[in-house]
Amino acid sequence: MVTRTTKTAGRCVIVGAGIGGLAAAAATAAFFDEVVVLDRDELPETAQHRRGVAQGQQLHILLKGGDTFLELLLPGIREGFNRAGACQVRHEADSIHFERGHVFPQRDLGYIHLGLSRPAYEWAVRERVRRMPNVVIHERRSVDHANVEAGRLISVGGTGDQQPFTEDGDLFIFANGRNGTLAQFLTKAGSGVVPTTELTIEVNYTTGRFKKAERYKGDNTQVVCFPGPPHRALGLLFPIENDEWLIALGGRGNERAPTDLDGFSNYAASLPFGAIADRVRDAQLVGPLRGFRVPSSTWWHYDRMPGFPRRLIPLGDSIASFNPTFGQGMSVAAGHAVALRNALAMSSDSGRGLDNCAEHYFPKALELTAQAWNTAAMGDLEFPETQGRRPEDFEKRLAFSEALRRAARKHHEVHKLRFEIAHLLSPVSAARDGPLAALISAELQPSL
């Protein structure tokens, strides 16, 4: 991995102060004289929800890969998470994992999950980034357009505190979420249409924050209930700060968890595994239950865009928005930021400066995007109502996924590898070609 940093004179402008934008600030600070982060929200001084993160009060998971990427960018950030009150969960010794009719063995795979709410993760990262001497975060600045001249992005503009503003820069990073605004800006600026891949998934989920019943105080067990097709319901329970739980119940299409407590509890009881219902029964709801709908997942293929402007880097959900059930968004964004840091170092070495930063960035960023996208898409495409192109070898991939699942239940080392792939620590190829491939292949026969 490239880690050398050579200072590049100039100014970097980042749109979005969520996990992706903050990670990008950490990645770029060593290369620029000034890094400016713009966000439309007023950012809270504590670990509080903010309006601009529409699903910020839903359950968010920082995968172990995301935790690792952030530690690379901000050494010591894990201690920051601990100071924010993170619950330490041993994967998978502290996990009750029900999937497709089977409960996985509770094995210690050698990894610790630091469980927090999304606002607490973001607050811990933001406080670190604020202390960087050449990084400034401007709140209440809503970007509504980008200016492109001679094939290069030269500025962004919008409204801040009811006044128009323009920000010039030498490099622009868009990390402003899953709404596709960057693609719209580029089309309006005359750069063309961004090719996209879209899956219509119609995922619904309801999340509540709960104080634990007395018998569960201090218990950091997490619960995962993925029944799989044909069942459309699922449940997740994760411990967070203040000895509380975030509990999310979800479904597809018309299958949705109610937003009243009795209905929510009954929905939990309807799951084919009772660990979540048992915990909800005596827990105390803190605040309202909130329901959300995610109609689709989208991948914007900026790398295939003939008119893609120089000096522009899309990052995180600006490249791909995933089914949130799989908890990949924050971690992919952090991985993109690591790819950006390495791309800046390579651009400096190339002698071409920032003009070829994107061509160094895209290969690694898109490799990570593809792994996350394919994991989520395979789960989505198993449901016949999901609209989107299925790969020609779809049935073969499903058979391999089932073989990996069975082998993981049987073998500790395969269980660990499956975890590492899901958490973006190892590539999928490690299951097909690595030293454990024979154990997985041995499980293929029953699928044929």
Feature annotation, model-predicted:
Residues 7-39:
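N-terminal Rossmann-like FAD-binding beta1-loop-alpha1 element of flavoenzymes
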Residues 61-62, 108-127, 181, 258-259:
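Short beta-strand to alpha-helix junction loop
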Residues 27, 47-96:
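N-terminal FAD cofactor-binding segment of flavoenzymes
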Residues 131-267, 271:
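Predominantly flavin-linked oxidoreductase catalytic cores and closely associated redox partners
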